[in-house]
Amino acid sequence: MFLLYKYDIFWAFLIISSVIPILAFLISAVLAPINKGPEKLSSYESGIEPMGDAWLQFRIRYYMFALVFVVFDVETVFLYPWAMSFDVLGVPVFIEAFIFMLILIVGLVYAWRKGALEWS
């Protein structure tokens, strides 16, 4: 009970970091114009009037390529701290990272065989 003063800065930061986004959303909701005209309902294409049908369906290949990119981007995020602290952590963590890499390589081979990496 006597050591709770250590967490005062944490609670202050938590409250402030929660209140600021809520206030930003509330202020924008109050100040934003509500009128919906033809300009608001039209599609936006880099400031140019849309030509033809603005609703275009993307091929699933783009989504698969993005998904594979995200998976290996997350892999990099996990492997970087491991590589920086490899000398401190020792062999057991090396084995865990090796298993992690093995699982990701199996996933890469699976995506490759399914054709998720083929662009054409």
Curated annotation (Swiss-Prot):
<keyword id="KW-0520">NAD</keyword>
<keyword id="KW-0521">NADP</keyword>
<keyword id="KW-0150">Chloroplast</keyword>
<comment type="similarity">
    <text>Belongs to the complex I subunit 3 family.</text>
</comment>
<dbReference type="GO" id="GO:0009535">
    <property type="term" value="C:chloroplast thylakoid membrane"/>
</dbReference>
<keyword id="KW-0618">Plastoquinone</keyword>
<feature type="transmembrane region" description="Helical">
    <location>
        <begin position="88"/>
        <end position="108"/>
    </location>
</feature>
<protein>
    <recommendedName>
        <fullName>NAD(P)H-quinone oxidoreductase subunit 3, chloroplastic</fullName>
        <ecNumber>7.1.1.-</ecNumber>
    </recommendedName>
</protein>
<keyword id="KW-0813">Transport</keyword>
<keyword id="KW-0874">Quinone</keyword>
<keyword id="KW-0812">Transmembrane</keyword>
<dbReference type="GO" id="GO:0048038">
    <property type="term" value="F:quinone binding"/>
</dbReference>
<keyword id="KW-0793">Thylakoid</keyword>
<dbReference type="InterPro" id="IPR038430">
    <property type="entry name" value="NDAH_ubi_oxred_su3_sf"/>
</dbReference>
<feature type="transmembrane region" description="Helical">
    <location>
        <begin position="64"/>
        <end position="84"/>
    </location>
</feature>
<dbReference type="Pfam" id="PF00507">
    <property type="entry name" value="Oxidored_q4"/>
</dbReference>
<keyword id="KW-0472">Membrane</keyword>
<feature type="transmembrane region" description="Helical">
    <location>
        <begin position="9"/>
        <end position="29"/>
    </location>
</feature>
<dbReference type="GO" id="GO:0008137">
    <property type="term" value="F:NADH dehydrogenase (ubiquinone) activity"/>
</dbReference>
<comment type="subunit">
    <text>NDH is composed of at least 16 different subunits, 5 of which are encoded in the nucleus.</text>
</comment>
<keyword id="KW-0934">Plastid</keyword>
<keyword id="KW-1278">Translocase</keyword>
<dbReference type="GO" id="GO:0019684">
    <property type="term" value="P:photosynthesis, light reaction"/>
</dbReference>
<dbReference type="InterPro" id="IPR000440">
    <property type="entry name" value="NADH_UbQ/plastoQ_OxRdtase_su3"/>
</dbReference>
<comment type="function">
    <text>NDH shuttles electrons from NAD(P)H:plastoquinone, via FMN and iron-sulfur (Fe-S) centers, to quinones in the photosynthetic chain and possibly in a chloroplast respiratory chain. The immediate electron acceptor for the enzyme in this species is believed to be plastoquinone. Couples the redox reaction to proton translocation, and thus conserves the redox energy in a proton gradient.</text>
</comment>
<keyword id="KW-1133">Transmembrane helix</keyword>
<dbReference type="InterPro" id="IPR023043">
    <property type="entry name" value="NAD(P)H_OxRDtase_bac/plastid"/>
</dbReference>
